[in-house]
Amino acid sequence: RTLAMLAANDRPLFREGFGPSAQGFTHVEWGDIENLKNKIGKHVAAILVEPVQGEGGARKAPRGYLKLLQDIANENGSLLISDEVQIGMGRSGTLFAYQQENIEPDIIALAKGLGGGFPVGAVMAKAKVGDAMIPGTHGSTFGGNPLAMRSANAVLDLLLEDDFLKSLRENIIYFENKMDALINDDDKVSPVILRKKGSGMLRGFQLTENITAGDFGNISREKGLLLVGAAENTIRLLPPLNTSKE
């Protein structure tokens, strides 16, 4: 299972040192629907997509892209899988990121925010998929861990509180405005920030050639701010969902 997920990732950095690589995965250019159409057919079991890429450089799927993916999957009898490990559980401004495109994936992968800091992962699936997952087709060393389940329930209780997501969306707008101000402070274009990226509370700054994401992260850490880099020379910003404007 671990080798399969490594093969699903298209970054050699994560696959180096592990092998042999699982076969059967085809990678397509992000957001390029024609590229996808040329590589998919009735032989494809499923399309796996991350609505907002984290490691890929805080890249949000173009408007309408997820709906096109679902249409293509339906036409070919393929499943649509939404990877919500990083963007799910409210980080997009809705409980799940796919909800903003009004689609219905067949499978959803969750982790990270699901446990609020405690290690936990989950897979949700439609009945037609779940019914096929008989004992032995899927396994987990710590599946159903009581402490992990309690942590996930606590997170869900908070996210589903009245007005929590509404307040979060207001903070997302405030956050985005502050990002704009950093790029164009007093109409002076930043010498290191090229543009903002991402969506919701998964944001990023693509940096100019003047500095690498690694160096930017090191400088930030020295000043007491922990940031993480990503593809396309991007620095990611992932504040807690309960962060206040102050």
Per-region residue spans from a language model:
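Conserved N-terminal phosphate-binding loop of PLP-dependent enzymes in the Aspartate aminotransferase
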Residues: 1-246
